[in-house]
């Protein structure tokens, strides 16, 4: 009811605030026998954690995850997996000036109205700091998906402000601080971000995520369509204002003869649908994109109001990302993994013994 959990068979529940003692999560429904340890999660946590480059927040958190339960002798037991990450680099005094003010564009005002109070330190529960636990849980899902089903999930920054990737080279993604797939644009990105930081402003971004080797048949009609659940999960990431599956909003300008993905026994001719037909996976790569707004935590003064309803001018202090899309890449991967993991378990529960006379496209 309180909106802190996602999933039906693979359930992830997170807790914690930006400046609290720790962040944590509980994973329910992970099958037993999966070899897992902290190192499996730490790789993605290190990709997401703050303070790793000059393009992200200066807050330095090691984000060392600890497994509290659900794993014995290196394997999942089938019981609840408890995870925790301690907060070690809070500077709550940076937020004392906004204790009685609302930052425009943030959740300060809406949290105050909903709950009658709020944790003003770094945004409290509304902070993207919470996503560290999603990444940890997503790493568990990613390992199961790859080890048991051969499913791989990769994300990348496809656009930062006006700069778009024209080449998709996954080999480049993990070798630059932007998670950007087009090496020819890296110098341009660097210059753009340096000028942006000088101005004290921020910028939006587009993040893309792709899952390959997904089997046919995942997704439930009508309200638990696979694309609906993916959109729900991705939309739940902080700062996301739009989600596209496949060609997304570009379909507005497409004709039916162009958009339909023609099929033959050898394979599909295209993938405008993004790997999902009728809410069910088609066996093609699942492709999703998210649009992320520019953070409102900037040093440019802005008009707002106080808790008492008086006019105020707000200048956000503290340490913030000038572009939240950069560190969102592993978060988007994690959310897609959690949804696919959940739907795999749901599909197995109901349809494990289903046999179709129709061959899988591309497998003949």
From Swiss-Prot:
| Annotated coiled-coil segments of the chain | none
Annotated FMN binding sites? 125-127, 238-239, 278, 293-297, 319
Under the heading Pfam families, the entry gives: Chorismate_synt
- Record-linked PROSITE patterns: CHORISMATE_SYNTHASE_1, CHORISMATE_SYNTHASE_2, CHORISMATE_SYNTHASE_3
Write out the GO biological process terms: amino acid biosynthetic process; aromatic amino acid family biosynthetic process; chorismate biosynthetic process
One GO MF term, please? FMN binding
Q: Which UniProt keywords apply?
A: Amino-acid biosynthesis, Aromatic amino acid biosynthesis, FAD, Flavoprotein, FMN, Lyase, NADP
Top-level EC class, please? lyase
Q: Give the metabolic or biological pathway.
A: Metabolic intermediate biosynthesis; chorismate biosynthesis; chorismate from D-erythrose 4-phosphate and phosphoenolpyruvate: step 7/7
- Extract the InterPro entries matched here: Chorismate_synth (IPR000453), Chorismate_synth_AroC_sf (IPR035904), Chorismate_synthase_CS (IPR020541)
The record lists the catalysed reaction(s) as:
5-O-(1-carboxyvinyl)-3-phosphoshikimate = chorismate + phosphate
> Known EC number(s)?
4.2.3.5
Query: At which positions is NADP(+) bound?
Result: 48, 54
User: Looking at the record's lineage, which domain of life comes first?
Assistant: Bacteria
Required co-factors: FMNH2
- Gene Ontology CC annotations of this record: cytosol
Q: Which HAMAP family match?
A: Chorismate_synth
Q: What does the protein in this record do?
A: This reaction introduces a second double bond into the aromatic ring system.
Q: How does it assemble?
A: Homotetramer.
Query: Mind telling me which NCBIfam families this protein's record contains?
Result: aroC (TIGR00033), PRK05382.1 (NF003793)
The entry assigns this protein to a family as follows: Belongs to the chorismate synthase family.
Protein's name according to its UniProt entry = Chorismate synthase
Gene encoding this polypeptide? aroC
